[in-house]
């Protein structure tokens, strides 16, 4: 996917709405929302890439729930997600 400065897949208005659901947040600038959106996209890309690598090892073309679960279990950087899975 080609990266363009200032563009994200996630709509900034929705990102800002999610951020503002935190009652401690009174204001969110467009730059902050953009940064959070880009970070979210990078996070999802990393998690999906790792899960896809596991699927490829099993000679599959698609990612399954179990692949994501295995990434969360095996990779310390995703440990904070372990409560979301039956690990």
UniProtKB/Swiss-Prot annotation:
This is DNA polymerase epsilon subunit C. It is found in: Nucleus. Keywords: DNA replication, Nucleus, Transcription, Transcription regulation. One of its GO terms (molecular function) is protein heterodimerization activity. Disulfide bonds: none annotated. As accessory component of the DNA polymerase epsilon (DNA polymerase II) participates in chromosomal DNA replication. It is required during synthesis of the leading and lagging DNA strands at the replication fork and binds at/or near replication origins and moves along DNA with the replication fork. It has 3'-5' proofreading exonuclease activity that correct errors arising during DNA replication. It is also involved in DNA synthesis during DNA repair. One of its GO terms (cellular component) is nuclear replication fork. DNA polymerase epsilon is a heterotetramer consisting of cdc20/Pol2, dpb2, dpb3, and dpb4. Also forms a heterodimer consisting dpb3 and dpb4. Interacts directly with cdc20/pol2 and dpb4. Pfam families: CBFD_NFYB_HMF (PF00808). Disruption phenotype: Displays partial loss of silencing in otr region as well as significant loss of silencing in mating-type and telomere. Decreases H3K9 methylation more than 50%, whereas histone acetylation at the pericentromeric region is significantly increased. Results in partial dissociation of swi6 from heterochromatin. Coiled coil: none annotated. It comes from Schizosaccharomyces pombe (strain 972 / ATCC 24843) (Fission yeast). GO terms for biological process: CMG complex assembly; DNA replication-dependent chromatin assembly; DNA strand elongation involved in mitotic DNA replication; DNA-templated DNA replication; heterochromatin formation; mitotic DNA replication initiation.
